[in-house]
Amino acid sequence: FVAPIVEAPGLSKTVVFPSGNNFVDYWDSTKTYEGGSTVTLNVSITDFPVFQRAGSIIPLEVSSRLTGHGLASDGHLTAMIVPTHTSTQDSQSTQGVHTATTTSVRRWKEESMDMSYKWPRGGLFQFQSTPHPTRGVIVLLRTITACPHSVIDELYGNEITAQASLEDMHSKGYGYFCDLRAKQLFVHLGHSSPHGNSITIKGISTLYAL
């Protein structure tokens, strides 16, 4: 969702967000907006307001600083995700104990690649992608409210190592970095794999999916 600045001096911009969805500022994962709301943003003529719909996957080929995600991601596809639950819930009661599961499945697909995620139950996030002929994948989860307990590479059966900084993650070319201040989790899955990717993130929560 794009709300360009087209008039000088451009000190403010009134944005009406479409109802039925929530939105996150593309440039800042800490800024979120409810669907159906009208918000006046303080902006300058050089700003470019862009918003990601909650629940969506945006694949990015980062090749310049204009994307706001740094040149360190160049050569990889960045799957930028704002996870949500669907409204479909399966609930059941057994011997007085009520349980509920909520499953969310979102998919992005192009000719050479398919990405999807699921949120089958609280604190468990699953991401899968088919192989890309030349590019590895970096998963970027937005609006997180708790860092994960662990990140598992399901294809190779090993735990992905937490890194101390985004720079460390990129320099090693593998691992994950959780930035609670920015409400973002990065998972670097290395170079292009002939088997695709499959990871499970445990113990995480986000603004729109607990």
Report residues per predicted region:
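Short acidic/polar inter-strand loop motif in beta-rich domains
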Residues: 204-209
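Catalytic core of carbohydrate-active enzymes
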Residues: 1-173, 177-196
